Amino acid sequence: MNMYAVFTLVLCGVYGVFMVIQGLANYRKTSGSTETFYNADRGVNTFMLVCSTAVSVFSGLAFYGWPSSSYKLGAGYISGMGAFCVGLEFAVIGYRLWLLGKEYGFTTPIDFLRSRYYSEKYGVFCAILMVAMIVPYVALQLITIGDGMNVSTKGFVPYFLAVLFACAIICFHVFGGGMKAVAWMDTFNFILGVGTLWVLVVVLVVRNFDGGMVGVYEAIKNDPVSVANLGAPGATGYFTIPGIINQALTASVATIVWPHIYSRCYIAKSKKNFEVMAWGLPLGYLMTFTGLILIGIYIGPGILGSGFDKADSLVPYLATNFAPPIVSAVAMLCLFAFAISTGESMLLSGTAMVTKDLFVRHRFLLKGLPADDKKVVHWTRIVVIIMMIGMLIIVWLRPAAIVDYAYKLSSPYFAMVMPAT
């Protein structure tokens, strides 16, 4: 067994055990009330809400996609942070959703959409399509973990074994703790993910270049493609001014309309949460995406040049081949933090829609029948297991179109169901 495998297995194993214990420790606390299981009693404090929202956006695709895309397209890709637009959305839209959630007991995006358009059928339509988008997207988080661990251990850990491990810890964590456990773990994952990312950045620079960041520039200054990618429009000409504005607005709008982010607006403790979100969330994005972009436009080209043909695995490749084994394992923890936070948040959102909006509402509430809170939580936990099985099937089949389906189609659809007013 190589040292990369040893360090990765130890760190990821400890992380997984800790996560399962933390989730199951909340089992009894969340079993008696849907308000606790779905909404954490609408009592999440400001720091936790900022961390939970930010890390739920970062996903395994950010870990792979941002360095890869910026490596190919240039520094203009950082416009995808959405800048101040992201904070503005939560101050303007998120705050109003919070008020409506408190007033009418909203839990899911469907609660609001159904009420806004006065249509049960529209609610069913949106719920089905949102769940249809969520399942492959969560599966994609598992795929990134499987690929990342396989690369980080230099093939020692099989892809599907890593996927099963990630699936198990997500399932047990959501099953046991609901939103209470998810929000707490997201805070831990934000600190872990950002911290490990910057450890990787510093180690790659110190270990591979004399003179720090100046040494990195010396390595790329004679490569016209790499130099062009340090600014806009980049070597490909992709990031013109309209292109940058389009990227910024699209990314920022997509943030709040994703179901798992939408639901974050309901769990805030007070108005102050949204005042801080207005500046705290863009700051959280900046801390993370700056590190990912630096790897893509600066460190990656400095080490590998501009013609690297495995850009889609840029971060794990650099961590495994140009950093000590312990740092490679640390980078794997960063991927775990991003992918698992997004995966479990979307899983919880999807199971809430299946259970509450599709089953309980139409089987009980619309017929005037009572629905016991304990039973609803129990049914939700069953749906968690069923949905995870569905995701494993997708991961096993691994259809080639899953990235296009989950990533390119879901964001525009989620954005289109947001009401115009």
Give a label for each model feature.
Residues G105-Y118, G177-F188, V257-F289, A311-L314, ...:
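Hydrophobic, small-residue-rich membrane helices and short re-entrant helix-turn-helix hairpins
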Residues F18-T30, G94, I134-L142, G146-S152, ...:
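Hydrophobic alpha-helical segments and their helix-loop junctions in multi-pass secondary transporters
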Residues M1-Y64, V174-G177, F190, T196, ...:
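Membrane-interface "cap" regions at the ends of multi-pass membrane proteins
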Residues R116-V124, V131, F160-L164, T355-P399:
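Loop-to-transmembrane helix boundary motifs in multi-pass membrane proteins
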Residues L24-Y27, G60-S69, V135-S152, V174-K180, ...:
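Transmembrane helix-loop junctions in multi-pass membrane proteins
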Residues Y38-G105, G243-A254, I261-G307, L318-T342:
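Membrane-interface helix-loop-helix modules in multi-pass membrane proteins
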Residues M19, G80-F175, N246-A251, A337-S345, ...:
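Helix-loop-helix module between adjacent transmembrane segments
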Residues G13, F18, F125-L140, H173, ...:
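Selective recognition of specific alpha-helical transmembrane segments in multi-pass small-molecule
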